[in-house]
Regions:
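Short, charged, solvent-exposed linker or helix-capping segments at domain edges/interfaces
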Residues: 117-123
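Non-catalytic interaction-recognition regions
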Residues: 2-117, 128-635
Length: 635
């Protein structure tokens, strides 16, 4: 019989609410340890003791599950003696098994059964919907998935749903954020910078949702400018309505390349292009109609590619959406703010005292520039959405521009200027197909699919067992591209390597999918001899006290840490934080297969181990979904 008292322990008002929302299983144990520290040293408040609890090291260097450095509390007396006093006064509790002193540090070991039951119950409760729960009440991020397991327990026609909520929290409840990312230029290549912005931005949008924020995903297209005049002239000469309908992005690029080549020897092309763009800006019906057709059909194609990447947008905005009136208003405000000065006929803002150089806000010919449109666009967005934060996911090459943009908004007196944030990243070097040619993202995705398909075919027996090789190879290829991009710090440049990223060995995307597939197979391979009870009955039916091996404890502590990993990633905006966790969990599970065997074991032990593996699959799946990946169950 479990000694665990009613979950959770009594709330302590001074602890931030997000610690007590059942999103981090270890928090209740930290709270128990913090209350004990406070009981011995009343001058240390419970919330300070709580914040001082750090996860202990695993493996040979392990001292305990939690470690706290008493020196941080600035207590009177020698830290080593204080640590010994704390250890001497300890008596086991339903949550805490033992504590010990090591120099100025105190370490806590948790009650094994309480640890396993709390963590597994929480993963189970926050992952699986029971038949009694409201299936319509899922958050957007929950990423509802259907599972045939246990379908016979539900009303006819309804599959058991999964809410995949473990690791999420409500710290951002009531707040809204706009994440602007991807932002390709119509009729120009979807290059490596756009790829990184797309991958990292989609992850950040998911990360905000996982932390309780309402998220608006915005794609700010490069959809205005003289290049549309060139396109119009080119389309008149080389265009095909049929090709445009089939694949607007590729066809417009082909037209753009051809007409630009013609323009090298025929200056009249550029004159006609300028005339067309003037008509666009004047609102000419024919010019705007043709531009709109180019834009709309390009967005249709973009949506197909984004859907393939498991990425979507709530709003397709763009340079064209920032009205002339808004730009004029922004310029008037700039001039009225007293920060603008004239320089050789142009208007500038001198930001040298902020170490940001000078920035032009209007050219000497009177035309607007990017920063003016950005100012007008940001103001329009705030008026429309009243966001609490807006994040621009843009390459580090634009660091100066974004810093100038934010500073000018601040100097103009916009109170929301300090809610804008630039999340930057380094460049991809050598992104191309294996033949050395690539212009569009879709070409890279098609090539990665081909490569993974070739790798899969090398194992003929396994290949025959794959239900849909084309689907599987596509998802594996996309995973390979994304994980290669996200596994290092985002500010670092990286080299695009086919052989490395498509390998099933080492820290690669295919390896993560393989780990998930293997975890997904455990239930299938052990049925019907060992079958988990329905989610609502697991806690009462499974004896977790049988999970006594050190390897099982290593797995459960890693699963328990996932909510804290999500919070850490939110502080740094580093997808590598989640990637590293997913790799670590996959490695630990890989080393557990020979120790924590399910097949052929006594039924109760097999059931407990099966629940542990299924929980690991649920957590790894959540990490992959957070990274915008689609976990595979078979390959």
């Amino acid at each position: 019989m479990s000694l665990l008292p009613a979950f959770p322990l009594p709330e302590v008002p001074s602890i931030p609410a997000e610690h007590l929302e059942s999103t981090a299983a270890l928090d209740v144990f930290k709270l128990a340890a913090a209350e004990f520290v406070h009981s011995v040293f009343p001058e240390v408040t419970v919330d300070k003791a709580f914040e001082g609890m750090e996860s202990g090291k695993t493996g040979k260097q392990a001292l305990g599950d939690f470690v706290v450095a008493l020196a941080r509390f600035r207590l009177k007396g020698k830290p080593q003696e204080l640590a010994e006093k704390l250890a001497a006064e300890f008596k086991p509790t339903p949550y805490l098994a033992e504590i010990g002193a090591s120099g100025a540090f105190v370490y806590f070991n948790l009650q094994t059964e309480a640890l396993f039951r709390t963590v597994l119950d929480q993963i189970n409760t926050q992952t699986h919907l029971t038949p009694d729960e409201d299936h319509s009440a899922l958050s957007h991020f929950a990423n509802l998935s259907l599972d045939d397991a246990g379908a016979d327990k539900l009303p006819e026609g309804l599959s058991l749903a999964k809410k995949n909520g473990y690791g999420t929290n409500k710290s951002g409840k009531g707040k809204s954020v706009i994440v602007e990312f991807s932002s390709p230029n119509i009729a120009k290549p979807f290059h490596a910078g756009h790829l990184r912005s797309t991958i990292i931005g989609a992850f950040l949008a998911n990360l905000y949702e996982a932390n309780g924020w309402d998220v608006l995903r915005m794609n700010y297209l490069g959809d205005w400018g003289k290049q549309f005049g060139i396109l119009a002239v080119g389309f008149e000469r080389y265009g095909s309505e049929e090709e445009l309908e089939k694949d607007a992005i590729t066809h417009l690029y082909d037209v753009y390349v051809k007409i630009n080549k013609d323009g090298e020897t025929d200056e009249s092309i550029h004159d006609r292009a300028r005339e067309f763009f003037v008509k666009m800006e004047a609102g000419d019906e024919h010019a705007v109609g043709l531009w709109k057709k180019f834009r709309d059909l390009s967005i249709v194609k973009y949506k197909e590619t984004y859907a393939r990447l498991n990425i979507w947008f709530d709003v397709y905005s763009g340079e064209s959406q920032v009205s002339q009136e808004a730009q004029k208003h922004a310029l008037d405000q700039l001039q009225g703010s007293g920060i603008v000065e004239e320089s050789q006929g142009a208007l500038i803002v001198d930001l040298k005292k902020y170490k940001l150089e000078k920035t032009i806000v209007r050219k000497k010919d009177g035309t607007s520039v990017y920063i003016t449109r950005d100012i007008a666009g940001a103001a329009e967005r705030f008026d429309k959405y009243h966001f609490d934060k807006m994040v621009y996911v843009v390459a580090s090459q634009q660091d100066l521009h974004l810093a100038q943009f934010f500073k000018v908004l601040d100097l103009m007196g916009y109170p929301w200027a300090n809610t804008l944030q630039h999340v930057n990243f380094g460049m991809v070097q050598g992104m191309s197909t294996r033949k050395g040619t690539a212009v569009f993202l879709e070409q890279i995705l098609d090539e990665s699919k081909r490569v993974m398909h070739e790798v899969m075919q090398k194992n003929e027996e396994k290949y025959k067992a794959i239900e849909d090789p084309q689907y599987t190879s596509d998802k594996l290829g996309i995973t390979a591209v994304k994980v290669q991009d996200m596994s290092g710090k985002r500010i670092n440049n990286y080299e695009f390597k086919w052989e490395r990223m498509t390998s099933f060995e080492g820290d690669t995307g295919p390896y993560l999918q393989y780990a998930h597939v293997r975890l997904s197979s455990v239930e299938r391979k052990n049925a019907p001899a060992v079958v988990l009870p329905p989610p609502g009955e697991r806690s009462a039916a499974i004896n977790v006290a049988l999970l006594s091996e050190p390897k099982a404890r290593e797995v459960i502590l890693l699963l328990a840490s996932y909510p804290d990993v999500v919070k850490a990633a939110f502080k740094s905006f580093e997808p590598a934080t989640i990637c590293t966790y997913a790799f670590r969990l996959s490695h630990v599970i890989s080393s557990a297969w020979e120790t924590l065997i399910v097949k052929g074991q006594p039924h109760d032990l097999a059931l407990a181990r099966l629940w542990l593996y299924v929980s690991a699959k649920d957590v790894l799946g959540n990490a992959l979904r957070l990274l915008t990946l689609q976990p595979l169950d078979r390959m």
